């Protein structure tokens, strides 16, 4: 195993303030979806946003990445611009360039601040760790869905980010590939990367999460340790969700 290949460039996450939403409001289709949403997450471990489809999980991730801006309120998780530039994001829809796997990884490094003289070596490390060396020269879009998703995640990790945001990382994947990706997520977390995952899969949340944020209709109904959420949910909505009554 290659040591420390996922260790963030700035590994001093202990010095960072918690991730904070302060009175965040967001309009979708001219209607308020989030209304004065406030919460706080620490910068260690794996946090999981869970809830039914359309509950607000993906919108929250997009606010964190800066892909969308709030209509009011603040999204704060660092005043350090170097940290903000080291965010890895994998959207639910796989988006790969019409290039080889190798060139997909190089492209991400080319638009980052990664040291120029270390980019090719970084690609070799990533390919070796992910066991993708045999497909390095193949078009990324010609791979299986599972391999494409693995390339997407490794591409996000190529820059050695401090934060990794994953939106439904195992959707539509077979059990074997799901296990590979979940093991990768655990390895990356142990290296010191803060990970936030969006999912509606309660079993995946149980396996991975240190803490759970349960979304329902644009609100965070519960935010607690994983064990507490599944053993003793406080709200009717959380209980119904765990019974499979709020999946749609």
Describe the role of every protein-language-model region:
Residues 65:
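Helix-to-loop junction immediately C-terminal to a conserved catalytic motif
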Residues 175-177:
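Helix N-cap at the start of a conserved alpha-helix in ABC-type nucleotide-binding domains
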């Amino acid at each position: 195993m290659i040591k420390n290949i996922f260790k963030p460039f700035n590994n001093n996450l202990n010095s960072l303030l918690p991730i904070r939403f302060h009175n965040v409001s967001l309009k979708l289709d001219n209607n308020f979806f989030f209304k004065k949403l406030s919460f706080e997450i620490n910068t260690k471990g794996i946090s999981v946003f869970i809830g039914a489809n359309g509950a607000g999980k993906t919108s929250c991730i997009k606010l964190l990445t800066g892909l969308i801006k709030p209509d009011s309120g603040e999204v704060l998780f660092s005043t350090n611009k170097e940290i903000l530039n080291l965010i890895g994001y994998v959207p639910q829809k796989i988006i790969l360039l019409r290039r080889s796997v190798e060139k997909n990884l190089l492209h991400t490094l080319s638009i980052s601040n990664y040291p120029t003289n270390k980019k090719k070596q970084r690609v070799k490390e990533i390919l070796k760790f992910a066991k993708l060396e045999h497909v390095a020269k193949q078009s990324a879009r010609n791979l299986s869905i599972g391999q494409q998703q693995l390339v997407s995640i490794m591409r996000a990790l190529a820059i050695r980010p401090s934060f990794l945001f994953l939106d439904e990382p195992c959707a539509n994947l077979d059990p074997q590939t799901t296990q590979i990706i979940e093991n990768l997520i655990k390895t990356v977390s142990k290296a010191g990367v803060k990970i936030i995952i969006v999912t509606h899969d309660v079993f995946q949340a149980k396996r991975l999460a240190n803490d759970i944020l349960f979304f329902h209709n644009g609100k965070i109904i519960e935010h607690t340790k994983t064990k507490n959420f599944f053993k003793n949910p406080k709200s009717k909505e959380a209980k119904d969700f765990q019974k499979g009554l709020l999946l749609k």
